[in-house]
């Protein structure tokens, strides 16, 4: 077992060490979508979390540097599409800037014209209720207005900087 890297009091941890440490926390992978100005847009996130059961709230954390989020934030509604193993190739491509994130996807339109994947493990239709600045990211909170789930696949996971599957 590797020893812990110590951080001197009053000093922030090195960015790479911080990412490596958080990379040890396995997460699911989601495709957050919206339709600002009627045009589909989406970004891959692994920072999705539930916030509240009553009312049902979720949050995700897009980067302040994301040009896609800069467009998406103009929309009132967004979708959360929980990805399965079958989506790994898509997730790799969609995580790159400038990618055509809707090519070869099967999707339908939800509230606010939000694109929703037809083969996602779960789909949440949400309305943005808050956005809070937090360092170099934002914390976006959405109220879940509708949802559906499916057991058609195993979840796609992200761990230590790589996509993974349950074993």
Which residues are covered by each model-predicted region?
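Basic, polyanion-binding surface patches
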Residues: 1-167
